[in-house]
Amino acid sequence: GAIVAGATPEQLGRALALAAALRITRFHVQNDFGDWDSVHHGFTYANALHQSLVRHPSPDLVRGVVHGALRVYLDRFLNVPAARLTAVEDADLEDLQACWDTQGGVDRAGGIAYGWLTCGGDRSRLVAALGHALLAEDAGFHWFQVVEAAVRQAAAWPDGSEEGALILAGAARFLAAHTPTRRELPHVVRTAVRLRRGDDLFEES
């Protein structure tokens, strides 16, 4: 219907990416933990396809929208029941740290991010908070994929839009679901910096 109505390839790809992002935003924590990978794959595929359609729209790539839509449709059971997204009033991004520090902060992380943006908060500050979590934790490749895709897709919508808020709230939920980690990465970075300076890591007795 959208194609017949004259939607552009970019618009089709952006709509698909939004639908895939909402699978993360509405992912209920009662699902198996491994199912986060299912919604992650659908979203990152849709983001990659959208970026390709922006650069080089073609009939073959538009066909990929159909494949992606089928994937999003097949993942619908992961949103039954759908997680409720309640905006946290007077949201403070510093409160996200508590969501990274303890298990069970998935819904609160989404509410903080959503509340921050819907109340006029600066999108770039939320993105910075998500980036800080990537650096502070032992982030996996999927984490970087989800955050990168969320930032790109949120930027595809007007600043202050509902769509952008929902997308970034989903990214916050995804990170909260996978934290805390052992947080060995900062130690590795500090060790690498010391080695680069030529410091002695161990002293012989």
What are these regions (language model features)?
Residues 1-205:
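Mature, well-folded catalytic/scaffold domains that follow N-terminal targeting or propeptide regions
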